[in-house]
Structures are given as structure tokens and as C-alpha cells.
Amino acid sequence: KSKFPSNVKAYTNINIAINKSNIIIIAIPGNFLEEILKKIDLNNKIVISLVKSVFVDQTGEIVTTCELIEKYFQTNVICLSGPNLYSSLDNKDLSEATIGVNDLETGNLVKKLFNNDFFKTQITLDRCGVELCGILKNIIAIGVGFLGNKPNSVALLIRKGLNEMYKLSLKLRNNVSKHTFYESSCGIGDLYLTCVFGRGKILAKHYSESNIIDSSNWEKLEETILCGMKIPDHHNVKIIGKLIEKNCWIHEFPIFYNIYKISWTNDSEKSLIYLKRNL
């Protein structure tokens, strides 16, 4: 059984842990993030986000995790994302990730912190592209789960899904880099891993196979399939789906939109048939 290394210390008071540190890694479910941000002080810290959630501000605009943290604090926020299963990291399998930053000096510091013999990182100044890859690839993985055991269709969905990921990201933040999506570990690499092994994909498979496809099933499946673990994937589906609907982008992003309809609307059955037959 795996154990934490001896230099890892646990605190019951989050503020004590933060006050003792100058680099903070945030890896919590996104639906709890704002509540926690209101209770802590991250000013003048280096913050590394592993959170794969998207938010909507008071004006109805999309906000990424890094952007949300920067709304609360004067701090330098970095995004770390890549194709990594915790069990594989624990085995010290060769792995990689992408560090998304706004300045190279901080990026090099974080790279030095994470790099070792089996874990390699690459730096990019496309922080927003890295974040959007992490958010949107989880939605495509939900679609893969809906398809079930159809390998040819899954390959088609991944290919077209990657294109929709990049096109939608350009609409949200027009300075994202194509390289981030098609050549980086956080893009095509993480998309592949998540679509094969991701928890969202597993959850979606059970969701589509249930007798009644209903949005209320998501929380029930988290309890039964994931033993109560909370994941952001289906919540991100809802936010992105409503965004596409609001902006009349339905025909530009049929994969994202049909995944949303299966997950959160009364048109689930019809949309599931469409997804399986009209990719």
C-alpha cells in the first residue's frame, strides 16, 4: 500500500499550512474552490493550480480557475496539466506534464520543483490554452463514455472532439496556441489518457447504461461508482453547453452540445442516438 513520503506533513488548519509555504498547490474539486478562497490568503504566493473546472462570473462570462484565483488575490498563478494517473506516478512510470505560465522566470522555478528522473515538464506561455485543454478534454471523455464499446466511433469522436476543443477555445480566448492542443502533453496527450482511463468516462458509461437517463443520476453515480469522490466533468458540461446555446454556436460545436443535451436536458435519449450515429 502506498504511503506519503516522510517529508509530507498534514495540517487540520489550512491557514497554518499556507502561512508556512511560499508555493501553494491547489488540487481540490472546483465546486468547493470559491468557498475555500474566501477563507485563505494567497497574496504574494506562487499558486499552482491542478483544478480542471470552469466558472461563470456575475456578467455571465466564462472564468478559468487561474483567473478566478487572480480575482481574489495579488498572486502569480500557474497551471499544471498533463496525462497522469496517480497510480502510474506512484509506480514512477515515465510521465510528463505542461506548465502554463505568464512569465518564464516563474515557469523555470516550477519546472525545477517538479522535474525528476521519471516526471518531465514543458513550459508554455499559453496558460489559458493549458487550462482550457484540461477543462474541455474531460467533456470529450464524457462523450466517449456515452458511446460505450465502439472503438471506431471513439477514435472519430476524439479526432473531431480535439478540433472542437481548439475552435471553442479560440472563441473564449483568441490568443490560445494551436501547438498547446495538438502537440503538447496537456492537449492530445491528456485527451487520449482521459478518454481511455478517465473517471468521467467511466461515470458517463454507467450513466448512459442506466434505465433512466436523467441528470439527477450524476450525484448518485459519484456515490456508487466513485465512492463519493466529486469530479468537475459533468458540471463543466453544463456550463459549456449553456454557453454554446446562449451564443447560438450549436452548429459549430455539435459534439459539445449533444454531450450537454444527454447530460442535462430532457432530450437525453434523442441526443444519445444522434451522438452514436451522426459523428
Task: Provide a role label for each language-model segment.
Residues N7-K9, F119:
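Short, conserved active-site loop motifs that form the nucleotide-linked donor/cofactor pocket
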Residues F4, Y11-L94, V110-K112:
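Rossmann-like NAD(P)(H) cofactor-binding subdomain of soluble oxidoreductases
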Residues K39, L68-V77, L94-F181:
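Internal alpha-helical scaffold of NAD(P)-dependent oxidoreductase catalytic cores
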Residues F4, K137, I142-G145, N152-A155, ...:
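NAD(P)-dependent Rossmann-like dehydrogenase/reductase catalytic/cofactor-binding core
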Residues S49, V77-S81, T121-L125, F253-I255:
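General beta-strand structural signal in soluble alpha/beta enzymes
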Residues V54, S81-S87, D103, L125-V130, ...:
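Glycine-rich beta-alpha junction loops
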Residues K1:
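Conserved N-terminal glycine-rich FAD pyrophosphate-binding loop of Rossmann-like flavoproteins
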Residues I25-I28, E61, N102, L157, ...:
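Catalytic cores of large soluble enzymes that bind and process phosphate-bearing ligands
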